[in-house]
Amino acid sequence: MAAAGAMPGGLLLTFLLLAVVASGAYNGAGEPPVSRRSFPKGFIFGTASSSYQYEGGAAEGGRGPSIWDTFTHQHPEKIADRSNGDVASDSYHLYKEDVRLMKDMGMDAYRFSISWTRILPNGSLRGGVNKEGIKYYNNLINELLSKGVQPFITLFHWDSPQALEDKYNGFLSPNIINDFKDYAEICFKEFGDRVKNWITFNEPWTFCSNGYATGLFAPGRCSPWEKGNCSVGDSGREPYTACHHQLLAHAETVRLYKAKYQALQKGKIGITLVSHWFVPFSRSKSNDDAAKRAIDFMFGWFMDPLIRGDYPLSMRGLVGNRLPQFTKEQSKLVKGAFDFIGLNYYTANYADNLPPSNGLNNSYTTDSRANLTGVRNGIPIGPQAASPWLYVYPQGFRDLLLYVKENYGNPTVYITENGVDEFNNKTLPLQEALKDDARIEYYHKHLLSLLSAIRDGANVKGYFAWSLLDNFEWSNGYTVRFGINFVDYNDGRKRYPKNSAHWFKKFLLK
């Protein structure tokens, strides 16, 4: 899940997303109907998840600690309800129930991530391969395939090995490139005969900005003046260094897969990026430029190297020597290193031009010289969800997809996350908690926006809703719920379909 804690600016309003209609489910009144049949033949629908947010079993089956285990246990004050992912949604034990839910809804695919430390407890081959971890993922993959659900596997969704953090500061060191490649190769060898779609990294933007600029996410590094109250870090350099190494690790892994595995296994490999859409705060060239810089610093940071072999000119100009350089060989390696792009979209912001800073407190959060806010003249850009950063703005989905088409050569895209949350209101009876009509409206409008982009030529091949289940939402803990299926955290993590799950079942009828 993309958690946008690093976004500078923004006014926190406590709007309810939309009033739940007590008389029954949202029926799409006033909106065109939409269903699976509206989309091109072969278009894939699925749900998405991640290992730390879902699995639990943190100390079971030979799994080693990740940076999120350390972060949540050492800094519970950085999580809204002081919680952690020790049990999470307990998919480590309940994965068969999860697959049954997908099958019942008619989903075609399931995007999940592998826990690096469940495969390599110490992060590297030298620490040994954990056969129990291999067995767990084999069981999950085989269960999915037996129910007709395609696995889409993400290799890294933010839970890097604590052992490598201790050894060489994790993604701040180029040493991680080979360790990641070794881990990826084990996954290709063990699972690639059945897995036809691989994603190397999930949202490097979120990992680097929240982990190294604001310090709100693991590993919790930032400059002393940033909001994360970190004991160590450099918000003006480390985000760029960590993501530079992620791009290089991605490219090396793609090269490995294409050289040794793709011809035999006949799979595809890509990377998942996140982007908001950015609307100029007012009609002016300076604000138009601010909106362009905002998308460069969130999306172009990764997309430009993947398409053109270097960072955006706006980043080169504003970040200067704090932004790492690619060698000629690295530039060639990164350029074109994907079969598809995964794209996560949730929300939009207004972008307002900021004057240059004094250059003393350099930080990724201010380098773009764009003030980002969900509110203009007291009016939000769209209804606000439970997460303070998430404003509902469906037209931004279409705008972003057409921006990708027009600026980056219309690559093959899978929407790897899209969704909305509600507050975890513990006083609601179960039957009331299952009434998530605002989520149905969110999906209906975003799927219409997606369909419009496809009809205008956007090369989108699939869509994954975030999320199958309620889960551990990073710094929000369990205070918000993104699931289309309810998880009862007080009764054995039992799952109950929300209204949105029933809506998807009707939507997906063939």
From Swiss-Prot:
GO terms for cellular component: extracellular region. It is found in: Secreted. GO terms for molecular function: beta-D-fucosidase activity; beta-galactosidase activity; beta-gentiobiose beta-glucosidase activity; beta-glucosidase activity; beta-L-arabinosidase activity; glucan exo-1,3-beta-glucosidase activity. Keywords: Disulfide bond, Glycoprotein, Glycosidase, Hydrolase, Secreted, Signal. It comes from the Eukaryota. PROSITE patterns: GLYCOSYL_HYDROL_F1_2. A beta-D-glucoside binds at residues 53, 157, 202-203, 346, 417, 466, 473-474, 482. Its EC number is 3.2.1.21. One of its GO terms (biological process) is carbohydrate metabolic process. It holds the Pfam family Glyco_hydro_1. The active site is at residues 203, 417. The keyword Glycoprotein applies. Changing residue 276 to M: Decreases the kcat/Km values 2 to 6-fold depending on the substrate. Glycans are attached at residues 122, 229, 361, 371, 425. It is an enzyme of class 3 (hydrolase). Residues 1-24 form the signal peptide. It catalyses: Hydrolysis of terminal, non-reducing beta-D-glucosyl residues with release of beta-D-glucose. InterPro entries: Glyco_hydro_1, Glyco_hydro_1_N_CS, Glycoside_hydrolase_SF. Disulfide bonds join 208-243, 222-230. The keyword Secreted applies. Belongs to the glycosyl hydrolase 1 family. Hydrolyzes p-nitrophenyl beta-D-glucoside, p-nitrophenyl beta-D-galactoside, p-nitrophenyl beta-D-xyloside, p-nitrophenyl beta-D-fucoside, p-nitrophenyl beta-L-arabinoside, cello-oligosaccharides and laminaribiose. This is Beta-glucosidase 12. It comes from Oryza sativa subsp. japonica (Rice). The lineage of its organism: Eukaryota, Viridiplantae, Streptophyta, Embryophyta, Tracheophyta. The gene is BGLU12.
